[in-house]
Amino acid sequence: MPETHQNTLTWKGTRLPAGEACNGCRERKRRCVRRKRELPCLSCQAENRPCDVSRYRRRRRRRRGPNKRNCKSLRVLGGQSAEPFNMHQQPDTDSCSEIQHGIETDECGSQCRIPSQSPGPYPEPQPAASTYSLCLPSYVTGVPKHLALVTLNALREKGAFTLPPAEIQTYLISSYIMHVHPDMPFLDLERLLEAVILRCRGRQTSMLLLQAVMFAGSIFLDPVYLHLMGYTSRRAAMRDLFGRAKLLYECGFEVQPTYKLQSLLLFTLFHEDDLAGSSFWMGEAWNLAKTIGLQYDLQEVPVDESSSELAFRRRLWWCVYTRDRLLALSTRSAMHISDGDYNVPMLALADFKSCFGTAEAYRALQLDSDLRTDGTKTALALTFIYKTKLSQLIGRVLMSQYTIGSASPTTMLYYPRPTPISLSDFLGMENDLDVWETSLPSLLEFPLPLLSPVSQAEKIIYAQRAMLHMIYLTCINALHRPWSSSAQPTSSDPWEGAFRDLSAWKIEYASQAILMIATHLHSIGLTNFLADTAVPSLLSAMITHIVRLNSDILVAPEANAVCFVQGWECLQGLREKYEWARHAAAFIRFTTRSLRTG
């Protein structure tokens, strides 16, 4: 064995990789291995050639830093350098003053614009939302990471991130609490008010949900404040505020399903879109509720959720269920939820603890302290609980007395069955409605007290009681109308004809009672508290009176005419807020004109 190889074997394990290669190894592109600070290396020693090292080092590739154009885009107005903004970090102030990657805002943090940049020869790739930070108020959650910059810019340009001034937000939220929240108490008002009104550090809400709340509050807000916002009419304000929330939903800005579900329930209050009406948004809400398993009782499975979270889920579920039933009763649209799809227990008073705001938040909203009394909370909670129980009966009535038919290629509506149900089934459902009415507590009984309400709490409770009885009377009308109008007997029972006459009388009684309630609310200035489901109730009652006035047999024609006129005045008062009221008024006007000319 040559000596060189013996040396190689002897040196094996003591050699180290060279920090700099010799000229021979560099030319042959070999690895240069030698002792520290000693020559020759192993390769040169084995080949018996000179080994020398020149002072040449491989230069490290310098990292590419930000170019001047990007550095300029990172600066805000005033020449100060913008620090990286963490979208999940809570700012110290209520509004931001700078945005990363060239987006800037004003003091309110709602209007954003992009600084001018010199265009390059090639379009730059759009970064994802993970490298983009939109400046939003501190009380709303940050920008999701999955949205592209072009999507966020489009949302910003269309005003999806624009919020009303703080004072107008206060009035909008107050309007929501007084008119919408008692009808659908799915919001955790304590968290919402702590974030938006009190600006508590660490409290945030969803931008999508906040925009939806702004839209719902604009339905009942005083027109003076709508004009201060720059809108010429309530319809324009509702359309604009709804459009902002709809853009955020369609672009997937919100990722938390509960916020999306709450917003979808508020979307059902918008009726002007023919393609995406209340029934469409209700279907979206039901699909999302199934996705998160809202229809299941989590008490039957071991979960790590607190009692307040379980109460919130129950309230949210029954709001979805009740809204589905009331929309089916009002618009004849097909129900999305079947009675066998859920096993959530009925609500209790303990489930409503977190749906009321704190006293400090109510004072900031200039709301009466009576809204936080135990009596007010109990009355509003019981009203919704009994409305939920009535909604279960509404589903049974619609499934038994009506069948689904196609009104158009994209619309399915309820129509009376060609053959009514048997007399025993009919009497069973009527008995269930009577049991529901007799089980009402004293503070929800009918008729309403004659004394007009004075405080805000009394007005809200009074209006909610009135709406509850209007829904009950509308359900009676829906139960008896197919039975009284059917010409085919279902059995040979001699009492069947008498029950048909009784059904006709109950329809007339229910219609007259609906108009009396609406007239009384109109006389004391509470028409503004009526929900959208009051419009179909008024329409069915007025149609009954039109038929009665046009019949040959008239009982108290003057009283019928007075009820009709008063119902018409109440319907006119709802035209500004609801598209349904405008269509109903046009239908009544066309019907009366046709009867006069015919």
UniProtKB/Swiss-Prot annotation:
One of its GO terms (molecular function) is DNA-binding transcription factor activity, RNA polymerase II-specific. Keywords: DNA-binding, Metal-binding, Nucleus, Transcription, Transcription regulation, Zinc. InterPro entries: Fungal_Detox/Toxin_TFs, Transcription_factor_dom_fun, Zn2Cys6_DnaBD. Pfam families: Fungal_trans. It is found in: Nucleus. CDD domains: fungal_TF_MHR. The keyword Zinc applies. GO terms for biological process: DNA-templated transcription. Residues 22-51 bind DNA. The keyword Transcription regulation applies. GO terms for cellular component: nucleus. Disruption phenotype: Has no significant effect on the synthesis of 2-oxocyclopiazonic acid, cyclopiazonic acid (CPA) and their biosynthetic intermediates. Transcription factor; part of the gene cluster that mediates the biosynthesis of the fungal neurotoxin cyclopiazonic acid (CPA), a nanomolar inhibitor of Ca(2+)-ATPase with a unique pentacyclic indole tetramic acid scaffold. This is Transcription factor cpaR. It comes from Aspergillus oryzae (Yellow koji mold).
